[in-house]
Design a protein with these regions (language model features):
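Active-site neighborhood of HAD-like aspartate-dependent phosphohydrolases
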Residues: 2-49, 55-58, 62-63
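Short, acidic loop-to-helix structural element flanking the phosphoryl-transfer center
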Residues: 5, 10, 85-115
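A short, structured active-site edge motif that brings together acidic residues
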Residues: 44, 73-74, 135-149
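Substrate-recognition element of Asp-dependent hydrolases with the DxDx(T/V) motif
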Residues: 99-131, 141-148
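Short acidic-hydrophobic, aromatic-tinged amphipathic segments that line or gate anion-handling sites
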Residues: 142, 214-219
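Conserved Lys-Pro-Asp/Glu-containing loop-to-beta segment of HAD-superfamily phosphomonoesterases
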Residues: 153-184
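Acidic, Mg2+-coordinating phosphoryl-transfer loop and its flanking beta/alpha structural elements
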Residues: 176-214
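Short amphipathic alpha-helix with an adjacent loop that forms part of the alpha/beta core around
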Residues: 222-231
Length: 231
């Protein structure tokens, strides 16, 4: 990555770069049961899309009157990573159209590329690796245990990008790409550009209504996406 990169691009993972079709959620529920025994753990009525893993953990613990201290959280993350690693095979991970090509094209053009995701760091890297992305193409990011809400993750990602590249980025040159209104919100709250993608549960129209600067069905139009992001 060019240390003089003018553009920073931060990708969400689930519903944006790839889909695991429920495997991640199932692995998380098994991890709760391994940690605390069968208690009927369920995400029924909980909006998973755009949620932070750390927040889902805290919510589940509170719901069942269980401790959510740091040691328990660390143990849960280990068990969840183990469950996910066993369940996640290339056959259950679907890469979204044009994503690998876009990441490569942005890097080739000298843009800095990172992650901004609700996934824990370890499981984020696990998902993108199994999906066939080069993990080294995302050398920094903000993850699901880095703050209490997605809006808190944006400054973390910007700080880590600055630390990695040795310079700060103008938020107007930062594009956050995601598939939920939470992704749009965490961009706009910090003066960044928001690119909504309809490969998750929300249509491009819904993402535009949430404040996206641009919303598309998918990222397959490589010249169009590259031009808009770097423009």
């Amino acid at each position: 990555v060019d240390a003089h990169a003018r553009n920073l691009v931060l990708f969400d993972i689930d519903g944006t770069l790839l889909r695991t079709e429920g495997v991640g959620v199932a692995a998380m529920l098994r991890a709760f049961s391994r940690l605390h025994g069968e208690r009927g753990f369920s995400f029924e009525g909980v909006e998973i899309a755009g949620a932070l893993d750390g927040l889902l953990f805290a919510r589940m613990m509170a719901q069942h009157g269980l401790p959510a201290d740091e040691a328990t959280h660390a143990e849960f993350q280990k068990i969840y990573a183990d469950e996910l690693a066993r369940a996640l095979t290339p056959s259950v991970v679907r890469r979204m159209p044009g994503t690998v090509e876009l990441v490569g094209a942005l890097r080739d053009a000298g843009a800095a590329v990172g992650l901004l995701t609700g996934n824990y760091e370890h499981t984020a890297h696990l998902k993108i690796t199994v999906a066939g992305f080069d993990r080294t193409h995302f050398p920094f990011g903000a993850f699901g245990a880095d703050g209490p809400s997605r809006r808190h993750l944006t400054p973390v990602a910007l700080e880590r990008a600055a630390a990695y590249l040795g310079r700060a980025f103008d938020p107007a040159r930062v594009t956050i790409i995601g598939d939920t209104p939470h992704d749009i919100d965490c961009a706009k709250a910090h003066g960044c550009r928001a690119l909504g993608v309809g490969t998750g549960p929300y249509s491009p129209e819904r993402l535009l209504a949430a404040g996206a600067d641009l919303a598309v069905a998918n990222l397959a139009d490589l010249p169009g996406m590259r031009g808009w992001i770097l423009g």
